[in-house]
């Protein structure tokens, strides 16, 4: 019980309080896309999906054809990124609405001069729930 009170005091939210988005979309000029738009772009093959999760999460399952660039490891992917056109549409995602790695990675990609970056904020959880194409390694 003491732990519960401590948690509530420190976080300013209760254990059973309503979940909030990890990152407010209004604080960024980032274009957020819906699951429907993500699926449309996936089917048209006009975009490269970029998974911002850790490598071990990516290996457990990811959107089919997605490239893994973990947010914390972006520097190790510089050569890979140099081989992608700066105009190529990149759809960045992470685990879901409680994960903001997709937004942070998208901002870093924009800093690297990629001009067509979008965020699929529903991410892996929403994609998997719809039973859309996935791969595992």
Where are these regions (language model features)?
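Mid-length scaffold segments of soluble, non-membrane domains
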Residues: 43, 48-72, 91-94
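Short amphipathic alpha-helix with an adjacent loop that forms part of the alpha/beta core around
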Residues: 39-41, 75-87
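Short beta->alpha connector loops
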Residues: 72-75, 98
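Catalytic cysteine-centered active loop of the rhodanese-like fold, especially the PTP/DSP P-loop
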Residues: 82-127
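Active-site neighborhoods of enzymes that stabilize oxyanions during catalysis
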Residues: 131-137
């Amino acid at each position: 019980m003491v732990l519960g009170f401590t948690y509530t005091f420190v976080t300013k939210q209760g254990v059973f309080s309503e979940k909030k988005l990890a990152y407010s979309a209004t604080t960024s000029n980032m274009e957020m896309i819906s699951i429907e738009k993500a699926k449309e772009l996936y089917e048209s093959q006009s975009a490269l999906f970029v998974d911002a999760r850790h490598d071990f999460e990516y290996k457990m399952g990811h959107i089919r054809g997605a490239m893994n660039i973990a947010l914390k490891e972006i520097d190790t992917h510089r050569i890979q990124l140099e081989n992608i056109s700066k105009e190529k549409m990149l759809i960045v995602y992470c685990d879901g609405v409680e994960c903001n790695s997709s937004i942070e990675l998208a901002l870093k990609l924009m800093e690297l001069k990629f001009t067509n970056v979008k965020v699929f904020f529903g991410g892996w959880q929403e994609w998997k729930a719809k039973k859309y194409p996935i791969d595992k390694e």
